[in-house]
From Swiss-Prot:
The keyword S-adenosyl-L-methionine does not apply. Residues 120-132 have a biased composition (Basic and acidic residues). Belongs to the ELP4 family. It is found in: Cytoplasm; Nucleus. This is Elongator complex protein 4. One of its GO terms (molecular function) is phosphorylase kinase regulator activity.
Length: 408
């Protein structure tokens, strides 16, 4: 039986007297983590790869908790450069960095990170600048007779780039100061093997297990999995693994068509993805897939990754001397885009992409053919043109059938 309705009592008085359980539904707020932003497609928290053009191709950036697999180019030059961009972005954004390698010492890799570019920020409320510019004001007015509109604008000074913005640009001609990347986690396989001599299982399985245990230790001790509260402000853990699966990791997938330990790398990726999904971390791995003899293994590696990008370098190939590709250094192939919190992936166009390495920056652009500005573009020789003009003039009647040719 419904409760009787009392007349004479307004709805506002009843709400004040008894209170109400109604609460306005608001959108959930994302954690204010430095160097991150929510995706406009699926609401996933994103971090930058260090290359803004690559972020745009991947749908805005790398989602936290995912794995990016970079298929190395022939000599590994550009793939290792992308890994350095990823690590440099983490250092500038204030993220924790974990570097693992079996070839180059991670300390040397961190010392070779590109330096971030500076922003030109106008400083309007600077007392020193106002004092210095108050004296020669008359001189500046005399000099600004033509460009008088610019004399009241604040001067522009180069300041260090802000760590709170998403995505930065880097100068490849300069390296980052060592103190910026001094605090990081490193895994150097030769040093680990020399300290751990006894191995009860196969060498490659032991190497991958030690790497996974090292990552688990950092994730758990630093509190990225939520088990232990982070002592400092909450941030993101960036994992960078170089040339995983190569012979330097004692793996034989790159040297034999039927390797004995073909499941060691796939088991490692299974464990790594499970660890990434339950922690505030993101990983980038480079794999020399061009050396893998069995292509079925390459297919498995792609299926075990969230995002797969391949680099095809022009070095040593026929396309290096092709004038159509003279402005580029290689092609970028996007093999896989993640499907996170949605049925389909981002619909951005990922075809016909090329990259070029300039003196200071690494850029990814849409592949387009340069305009052909030569004198003989799509034309025959002058003799052929004269012959065709003669045929045309002969069919135009007696008035046009003289000795002169049609001039186009």
């Amino acid at each position: 039986m419904a409760a009787p309705c009392h007349r004479g009592v307004s709805a506002g008085d009843d709400a004040v007297g008894t209170g109400t359980s109604f609460k306005r539904k608001v959108r959930g707020k994302f954690p204010a983590l430095p160097g991150t932003r929510p995706s406009v497609h699926n609401g996933q928290l994103l971090v930058s790869t260090g290359v803004p053009s690559l972020d745009h191709i991947l749908g805005g950036g790398l989602a936290v908790g995912t794995l990016l697999l970079i298929e190395e180019d022939t000599y590994g030059t550009y793939s290792h450069l992308l890994l350095k961009y990823f690590l440099a972005e983490g250092v500038v954004s204030g993220h924790e960095v974990f570097v693992a390698s079996a070839n180059d010492d991670p300390t040397e890799t961190l010392q070779d990170l590109p330096s971030p570019l500076t922003d030109e920020v106008p400083r309007q409320n600077d007392p020193k600048r106002t004092k210095d510019t108050s004296g020669p004001a008359d001189d500046s007015q005399e000099m600004m007779k033509i460009a008088w509109r610019y004399q009241n604008l604040p001067k522009v000074e180069t300041l260090p780039i802000s760590s709170s913005r998403f995505g930065h640009y880097y100068d490849l001609s300069k390296t980052m100061p060592p103190e910026m990347s001094a605090k990081s986690h490193r895994f150097y396989l030769p040093r680990i093997m020399s300290a751990n001599q006894k191995q009860n299982v196969s060498e490659v399985t032991c190497n991958y297990n030690q790497l996974l245990e090292s990552i688990q230790r950092v994730v758990h001790q630093e509190g990225y999995d939520g088990s232990n509260p982070q002592k400092r402000p909450k941030t993101i853990l960036r994992l960078g693994i170089e040339s995983l699966g190569s012979v330097l990791w004692a793996d034989d997938i790159c040297s034999q068509e039927r390797p004995e330990n073909q499941h060691s790398l796939t088991r490692f990726l299974y464990g790594l993805r499970g660890l990434l999904r339950t922690s505030l971390s993101v990983c980038v791995i480079t794999v020399p897939t061009y050396l893998i003899q069995n292509k079925a293994i390459t297919t498995r590696l792609r299926s075990l990754s969230d995002t797969v990008v391949g680099l095809e370098s022009f070095i040593g190939s026929e396309m290096e001397a092709n004038p159509l590709y003279k402005d580029y250094h290689g092609l970028l192939h996007v093999h896989q885009i993640p499907r996170l919190n949605s049925l389909i992936s981002d619909g951005s166009d990922t075809k016909d992409l090329a990259f070029k390495l300039k003196r200071k920056i690494f850029a990814i652009e849409r592949l387009h053919l340069p305009p052909d500005l030569s004198d003989t573009v799509s034309r025959s020789s002058k003799q052929d043109l004269a012959g065709s003009a003669k045929l045309l003039s002969s069919g135009c009647g007696p008035a046009a059938g003289g000795e002169k040719h049609l001039d186009f």
